[in-house]
Structures are given as structure tokens and as C-alpha cells.
Amino acid sequence: MSFNCSTRNCSSRPIGGRCIVPVAQVTTTSTTDADCLGGICLPSSFQTGSWLLDHCQETCCEPTACQPTCYRRTSCVSNPCQVTCSRQTTCISNPCSTTYSRPLTFVSSGCQPLGGISSVCQPVGGISTVCQPVGGVSTVCQPACGVSRTYQQSCVSSCRRTC
């Protein structure tokens, strides 16, 4: 499954210039995190092991210095037959010098004991690397430097099962 951004008109520029959105193709699998791609194409949701990309964020209409940068830290903690993944996504919007953080939790329940050993798990239905989102799946960052545009980072993730 892939998604392509294309050239868009940028009506927000007073001079009526063209907003050139770089073409970015995302080939998705259930085991790969899609990068932020410079804030251009963002994943909107994650279901059944596939990225569902249904929108293209035109951040190039704002000054480059005000585009948020996504820093990702993912940690997985394993319990018998359960993997809990905690993701902290930080979006920094410069020159606003404002940092927005929101933790997101993903739980994978597709594990069952293997050979009666509770500390070893195998996937149910052949899916071992998918963490389904629980609760919110997006982080909204809005600069505090007078720019009214809202940057929305849809921060959903897959994680590797470590149990």
C-alpha cells in the first residue's frame, strides 16, 4: 500500500505563489514505522497491520523554520503474552521555541503461550508485530509565534514483539 503526495495550490500565500509539495511515496508494512517525511505525508491511522494514509499535510505553505520536527522514542515492555509499547512524540516548532509532548500507548494482545511456557509467546493469527492503538492516536502541535496554522502529527506506530 502506498500514498503519493502531489503538487498543490497554496492559497494561503498573499502573493498567490505555488505550493510545491515534494512527492513522497510510503511503502508500508506492519513492521515498519513510517517516518514523519518532513511533515508532508503523515499516517492517519493504523489498522490490521497496514498504514491508512488518507490525507496530505501541506506544511510547505508555512515558513520552513516553523515546520515541526518529530522526534520518536519507542520502548517496549514485555509481560507473558502481552506487549505494551509506550511512545513519546515530541514536536518542536522553531522559531517558536515551544515543545509539545504527548505520550501514546499501544497494546498488542495477539500473543498466546508457546509450549506451556508463560514467558515465551507466539502470535495469534500469524500477527506478531502489530501494536493496536489504545485511546488517542494523534498529537496536535500549534506554534505559539503568531502562526495560526495547526500542525497535526498522526503518531501511530507498530512495534516488534519482544516476549
UniProtKB/Swiss-Prot annotation:
Molecular function (Gene Ontology), one example: structural molecule activity
Superkingdom of the source species: Eukaryota
Coiled coil: none
Region annotation (4 X 10 AA approximate repeats) ranges: 111-150
One Pfam family matching this protein: PMG
Ranges occupied by Sequence repeats: 111-120, 121-130, 131-140, 141-150
Keywords: Keratin, Repeat
Tissues of expression: Expressed in the upper matrix and in the entire hair cortex.
GO cellular component: cytosol; keratin filament
Record has Glycoprotein as a keyword: no
Protein family: Belongs to the PMG family.
Its biological purpose: In the hair cortex, hair keratin intermediate filaments are embedded in an interfilamentous matrix, consisting of hair keratin-associated proteins (KRTAP), which are essential for the formation of a rigid and resistant hair shaft through their extensive disulfide bond cross-linking with abundant cysteine residues of hair keratins. The matrix proteins include the high-sulfur and high-glycine-tyrosine keratins.
Protein name, UniProt field: Keratin-associated protein 11-1
